[in-house]
């Protein structure tokens, strides 16, 4: 199985199912960041828009409302699990100018010159061949079409992810991803993203560095948040099941010690650092 197929399997099965289960939590965490990226996304009523790696559809719906019924938005994701949830979400809201499909943005054919603009909230970091993927997006954009996306900066600058993981890695073998390999932090390096976009044909590339405190595990006690993290994080969930009770308790106590300063009024409040990138065809 190649790395792109592995990502599809991961996001359709283990990670996708957990994401759908925790959809409210994930959207609460990511929506403020997505909203900032959308504020940089120059779309107007009547445009046709592509939402890349749309997940469970929250940004797709936001875009659909902004372009009104004159335009439409296509939400594409290679996770069937998440697309099914996105369809339910949009139908519940009665959104008409929207369509969802299971598509591999890297490898599946997209309609040529179909879209005025493309957007992604943390959905473009998982390609095994990013230049191939971004060229495919490029082909789907009309002349002077715009692409805007948000992605994480370095793992070390995002303690919401890194702080607990560093503790877990002391007790469980969590494979370290190779530099720039598919994953949440694939585009931490600004020059790497710039080279991908340039080699894919884009112009007028702009970067915005965005720092924002984000909420995790809203409504939970600190202890419940740690338990949820330990039991539900896809990259080590299976290995955690076979870990001894003593080691699990050590992990719990060490994470509690590190996370306590971030706990504020029934949620964890962590700093985050992202890139928002804008460019044109």
PLM region descriptions:
Residues 200-203, 226, 273-281:
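Core SAM-dependent methyltransferase catalytic element
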Residues 68, 127-128, 141-143:
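Helix-to-beta-strand junctions that scaffold the AdoMet/dcAdoMet cofactor pocket
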Residues 4-8, 15-22, 206-266:
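C-terminal helical/coil "lid" or tail adjacent to the Rossmann-like core of SAM-dependent
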Residues 131, 142, 146-218:
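Conserved catalytic/acceptor-binding region of the Class I
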Residues 116-131, 153:
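A short SAM/SAH-binding and catalytic strip from SAM-dependent methyltransferases
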Residues 48-108, 132:
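Class I SAM-dependent methyltransferase SAM/SAH-binding core
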Residues 106-118:
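A short acidic, Gly/Pro-enriched loop at the edge of an enzyme's catalytic core
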Residues 1-47, 58-62, 82-85, 89, ...:
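Conserved class I S-adenosyl-L-methionine
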